[in-house]
Amino acid sequence: MTGLFITLEGPEGAGKSTNREYLAERLREQGVDVVLTREPGGTPLAERIRELLLDPSDEPMAADTELLLVFAARAQHLQQVIRPALAKGCVVLCDRFTDATYAYQGGGRGLSIERIAQLEQFVQGELRPDLTLIFDLPVEVGLARAAARGRLDRFEQEGRGFFEAVRQAYLQRAVQAPQHYRVLDAGQTLAQVQADIDALLPSLLEACRG
């Protein structure tokens, strides 16, 4: 069985984590070996970096610092989890990856896309996701869902303009490379979103079986 790298992306409150679990369950029902992971994080060291990135109580973080911490966590994650799992033929389902960097640090923070691309090449080499699922929904809906979860992290405390830029950056990437992306309407009911995921299963299983 061929290793497959699938990332799940979207703004706050889009339901990525819930739907990642659902997709993993559906793949495992078909005998697929699935590794679930997330960014920032995925290893003990990368999770410590995640805490720095999300903690709203720390000193104000410069945008460049944020970008470099994201890629530092990613480098560790790739070496310790993602590359070994793909080499074993697993399907890796990752909650956020480099598209999130282009969306949040590029779109939201306004950092240079060229700089992000340079770091992407340095850290990842030629490794890119085989498929990215973007869970899209109106910003106000996502922020309301995030607020309902309780205490907001450092990113969730950003204003609406930030998240509008994040959303548009995601959608622009999907337009630029439609063969690598599927945009799902995360504003639907959970059952409807999962029906859309089910519709993708045959092609995913075919790719897994090479």
From Swiss-Prot:
- InterPro entries named among the record's database cross-references: P-loop_NTPase, Thymidylate_kin-like_dom, Thymidylate_kinase
**Listed EC numbers:** 2.7.4.9
Q: What does the record give as the function of this protein? A: Phosphorylation of dTMP to form dTDP in both de novo and salvage pathways of dTTP synthesis.
Q: What class of enzyme is it?
A: transferase
Q: Where is the signal peptide?
A: none
Gene that this sequence comes from = tmk
- What GO molecular function terms would the record report? ATP binding; dTMP kinase activity
GO biological process: one example: dTTP biosynthetic process
Organism ancestry: Bacteria, Pseudomonadati, Pseudomonadota, Gammaproteobacteria, Pseudomonadales
Which reaction equation describes what this protein catalyses?
dTMP + ATP = dTDP + ADP
Annotated protein name in UniProt: Thymidylate kinase
* Protein family (similarity comment): Belongs to the thymidylate kinase family.
Record's GO cellular component terms = cytosol
Which Cys pairs are S-S linked? none
Protein's organism: Ectopseudomonas mendocina (strain ymp) (Pseudomonas mendocina)
